Amino acid sequence: MDNSMDINDILLSDDNDYKSYDEDDDSISDIGETSDDCCTTKQSDSRIESFKFDETTQSPHPKQLSERIKAIKQRYTRRISLFEITGILSESYNLLQRGRIPLLNDLTEETFKDSIINIMFKEIEQGNCPIVIQKNGELLSLTDFDKKGVQYHLDYIKTIWRNQRKL
């Protein structure tokens, strides 16, 4: 009976074995480092301290979390996709073809002689396109979107149409 072990004793002895193994690794790494200070911090100590610091910043209050989610949604709403810009282009083209007057800053007789596609691109680049789309429950015009994203997609569409000789 003296030699019999309880399950808890086995578990405790296993934990101690792992701890002694970890301590051996730390002592080996300390041997490799040469320093004059007797009070040096181990690398594992610095990780624990930084973990404690991150732990306090990672637990926001529910109110802060909802504000953060709103900010992320608003930032996402302001990005325009290629699909959305294509819809705006097609709607603008249809309205111009049906007789809508182009909303350009320099409206002249030459504007009416120009291609509808070129007029459509000029309107969008100048920020005068009257098309409004609904995204995430909001009605947005092209001026509400990120200017770089809109211009990037317009340039992409223009290069495709130039390669297809439609522009």
From Swiss-Prot:
GO-annotated cellular components: DNA-directed RNA polymerase complex; virion component
Gene Ontology molecular functions: DNA binding; DNA-directed RNA polymerase activity
Membrane-crossing residue ranges in chain numbering: none
One GO BP: DNA-templated transcription
Expression triggers: Expressed in the early phase of the viral replicative cycle. Expression seems to continue throughout virus infection.
Catalytic activity: RNA(n) + a ribonucleoside 5'-triphosphate = RNA(n+1) + diphosphate
Keywords for the protein's UniProt record, in alphabetical order: DNA-directed RNA polymerase, Early protein, Nucleotidyltransferase, Transcription, Transferase, Virion
Chain positions covered by the region annotation Disordered: 15-41
Subcellular location(s) per record: Virion
Family as reported in the entry's similarity comment: Belongs to the poxviridae DNA-directed RNA polymerase 19 kDa subunit family.
Assembly mode: The DNA-dependent RNA polymerase used for intermediate and late genes expression consists of eight subunits (147) kDa, 133 kDa, 35 kDa, 30 kDa, 22 kDa, 19 kDa, 18 kDa and 7 kDa totalling more than 500 kDa in mass. The same holoenzyme, with the addition of the transcription-specificity factor RAP94, is used for early gene expression.
Protein task: Part of the DNA-dependent RNA polymerase which catalyzes the transcription of viral DNA into RNA using the four ribonucleoside triphosphates as substrates. Responsible for the transcription of early, intermediate and late genes. DNA-dependent RNA polymerase associates with the early transcription factor (ETF) thereby allowing the early genes transcription. Late transcription, and probably also intermediate transcription, require newly synthesized RNA polymerase.
Name used for this protein in its record: DNA-directed RNA polymerase 19 kDa subunit
Species for this entry: Fowlpox virus (strain NVSL) (FPV)
